[in-house]
Regions:
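Short, conserved beta-strand/beta-arch hydrophobic-aromatic motifs that form part
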Residues: 28-84
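Charged, terminal alpha-helix-loop-beta segments
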Residues: 2, 19, 42
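Generic secondary-structure transition motif, activating predominantly at the C-termini of alpha-helices
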Residues: 4-5, 22, 71, 102-105
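Surface segments flanking catalytic/ligand-binding clefts of nucleic-acid enzymes
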Residues: 13-28
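Solvent-exposed, charged helical/coil patches
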Residues: 1-14
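A generic alpha-helix structural signal
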Residues: 11, 15, 98-101
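Well-ordered alpha/beta subsegment
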Residues: 76-108
Length: 108
């Protein structure tokens, strides 16, 4: 996984918020991404040099996304499971991403 310090800071902020959702969350790192699981994977995070790609295990139509940040990737090849993608490249993206992650976690 290639990333810089700022990308790792974004990941660590997100990871801490995700883990605070509940004590039933398991982290499973793979070669290509990091999976966060409850009963099943609800989000996968792919590290890129200057951003994170989050794959949410929900259809984009099921998510409340007032900022239109979610991209439907159900017909596009990608790492991780999940049909909805959101990009996190700046700390200001974290609250929006986390609100979407929370929605998927609560449904899992």
């Amino acid at each position: 996984m290639v990333s810089n310090d700022e990308t790792m800071d974004l990941y660590n902020d997100l990871k801490n918020q995700i883990l605070n959702l509940g004590n039933d969350i398991e982290i499973r790192p793979t070669k290509k991404y990091v999976a966060f699981r409850r009963k099943q994977q609800f989000v996968g995070i792919v590290f890129l040099k200057e951003k994170l790609k989050l794959y949410l295990n929900a259809d984009s139509s099921q998510l409340q996304d007032p900022f239109n940040k979610v991209r439907d990737v159900s017909n596009i090849g990608h790492y991780s499971s999940g049909n909805s993608e959101i990009i996190v490249s700046h700390p200001s993206d974290i609250p929006v991403a986390f609100s979407l992650i929370r929605q998927v976690y609560e449904k899992s």
